[in-house]
Amino acid sequence: MIITIDGPSGTGKSTLAKALAQTLQFLYCNTGAMYRTLAYARLQPDWQEVPLEDFLASPPFSFSFSKDSPLQAFYGDRLLTSELSSQEVANFASLFSKEPLVRAYMQTLQKQYATVGNCVFEGRDMGSKVFPHAEVKIFLTAKPEIRAERRLKDLPQGSLSKEALMAELIARDQADQQRECDPLVIPQDATVIDSSDLTISQILEKILPLIPSHLT
């Protein structure tokens, strides 16, 4: 079974997807982290001038995904963790993900991971493009100020003001919604949930009744 959770940044997708996967004993795949991994690798000096086709044909990054562990990202042999949370990487990932070659490459990987077992996929086009026939589709929204407060917790203290981050989030929304290749849209048949004033437990209470009873 595939469950998709889509929505813009700061709506609580990652926290919800992890909690839902843990509750159901499903695998969890953070596809945003996959795009940020590509962006991080592309920003490294040795790879900035390499043609995109060559970069993707012999990538300096890799992923580990199995029933025993969530998605892990590597640059060479080094496990990437905090590197993927920087605003520079996030901003470049937004630009880089517009490339049709990049999206096709990533979507192929994501579909391969779906064969491993029951999975919760989190991203921006999971229910609309990658898994349009997913059994359960969730689309999260939240007020911009709430989203900015949440994202600030992931950034080094003092690196950005709430107002500046909120402006960046709104600009990212517009870019995601207006890109020609797989824009951010509410998937057909998706359940839309505003997470602004809800806890993760309250959101789970809305979602679990959508799951077949033998899996909950």
UniProtKB/Swiss-Prot annotation:
It is an enzyme of class 2 (transferase). Keywords: ATP-binding, Cytoplasm, Kinase, Nucleotide-binding, Transferase. HAMAP family: Cytidyl_kinase_type1 (MF_00238). GO terms for cellular component: cytosol. It catalyses: CMP + ATP = CDP + ADP; dCMP + ATP = dCDP + ADP. This is Cytidylate kinase. The gene is cmk. It comes from Chlamydia trachomatis serovar D (strain ATCC VR-885 / DSM 19411 / UW-3/Cx). It is found in: Cytoplasm.
